[in-house]
């Protein structure tokens, strides 16, 4: 049975509208005249999922994505298919989260609906009528972003959006918040961490298991987090060199960790530095200027390998990347791993693309068999 812990947040915040921009607003560049060359190099597939993508999650052995309705495919499958979920109810799914085999789909202002593979019913979660978004936390929990009513809303927090979080913390568009030691309550009371120097608006957040990263217009900030989730003594930051940043994700491959920063034209990459000696337990050292790359394709182990850089530049590198989704390989079904470390097995990489003409808007994936980017 699927019984995730679902929380409501006491801090009044509203719908994640900034993440649901029309694709025509994501970029204004004119890319006409280049696509014949692209098609000669790699045959671009017709999209399985039409239109802009607002979320992608893994639940059990399946992937789920939304363009307003729910779609699914097998983890190692090729084609996406629509799920008979909320059909005929005139409901638009704005965000997704997952816990075990359950998918939680938020219809902004209406509520959160739970879907489990193989079911046909649409079960609305209790006490979610004012949900504005559902967010997947780095520790596996699912958190709801809720407006608590007009009488509780103030101008200062009317545009605050929940972005992410993990053990002992939440990240919103206006700050980093620490949570009380007990997580059993339905409504969370949070305290803003004044040591976080990131200036609002915060655009996205990500976690690599040890550190939490926060994206702003010009910089990425890092908060060191040990296993107990205690407060760090330092923050560090670095300029990311990405124009008009939109998304942030952690990508691990062959024992190395990278931050991927989606922007107006493709995405940049920051290799996470490894602390030496005992310093890793007491100081924040992952972000260094020499490891910042304005675009991917600069090395063998990065998310787009160096040998695939040209094909990346002629496709993903020309369009806005508004979402980055890193999916760990499923190695339980007889697939042989290259190493006993999960960080050595290259994960699958998907991006949500926005093309000004909408011709190439949609979900794209890096194909490790051909080492090329192509549309899903």
From Swiss-Prot:
A lipid is attached at residue 29 (S-diacylglycerol cysteine). This is Uncharacterized lipoprotein TP_0134. The keyword tRNA-binding does not apply. It is found in: Cell membrane. Keywords: Cell membrane, Lipoprotein, Membrane, Palmitate, Signal. Belongs to the TP013X lipoprotein family. Residues 1-28 form the signal peptide. Its main location: membrane. The keyword Protease does not apply. It is a lipid-anchor. A lipid is attached at residue 29 (N-palmitoyl cysteine). GO terms for cellular component: plasma membrane. It comes from Treponema pallidum (strain Nichols).
